[in-house]
Amino acid sequence: MRRNMGFGLVALALAVAGLVYYLVRPLSVEPSPAEFHCYDLDDGVYAPLETPGQAFGIGLAYAGHIRETASEFNPDGIPPVFTKSPQATVRTDADLRLPTPDALFDAADAIEPGLGDTLRSDFPNLSPLLDYEVEMGFVLLEDIDPSQLNDPTFSPKLGFFIANDVSARSLAILGEGKPNRYDYWGASKSLPGFMPLADKAWTPETAEPNGIPCVEIETIVNGEVRQHQSTEDLIYTPLQMLRFIHAEFPEVALDEGTVVLSGTPGGVAMTTPRWLVRLGNLFGLSRLKKLSAKLGADTSRFLRVGDRVTARGQGLGKVTVTVVP
């Protein structure tokens, strides 16, 4: 009997050790920055940035943001790619209206009919969990033929600028476990005022393969620096991002004036310990349970009415918005 008890204790210890390893194990592959040609900002010109005809976003493009959101990384896969509504564009000193629960319910219904009614019942006072994301964006200065994207030496003509990829995280969470998960991301980033863009874009005199302005970008909320990172730490080049967009949206033409937001560094309000995410997945928590857990946790770093938010980049200008009711 003692021998059986001993075997049982050993089995229990092994099971606990296995669970702990599952919860805290590191990423199988650590993300690393791409290799860039760093432009000299003195060798270029500034031009007005027009409101885009179409806009895309790339997610999880900095290692720090992958870690803080407990996301996975596949170096051979395509990162999150989503569309943003051009109608969400605003400029510096604009008011950023905090979405009401009804606005969130309507946005949820637009992407998944009936979801809004579920949210009205379960979360009548739903918070948007409003978040900030400083990003270096780029605009296409010419139409791009998809066949050009397969040439590693292709140097698309781009203009670079600063943007704030504002997000309603409560909507994004609802995509958990859905095959079209990143459509929910796009919806969460396309509410009115959710794409503050700088007024001007910087363009190099000569386009170089994998060329970008290697500059420091940051988000400041009420005078506090929340994000600060060099664009040189991006995991993907603009050419790779355009390939990803074409792979996910092959029917969409990459026309002149298209805007791409290249991803945000670490420091956003939406952070989750990796072990907690894995534990939730282990127990099969539904997306609504995950949303409830996030709403019940500390939400003090999410944006509130009265907050003044500036996204800026060295040599690329800035865009400031104020959250209003």
Regions found by a protein language model. Give the residues of each.
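Charged, cofactor-coupling segments
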Residues: 99-105, 192, 196, 232, ...
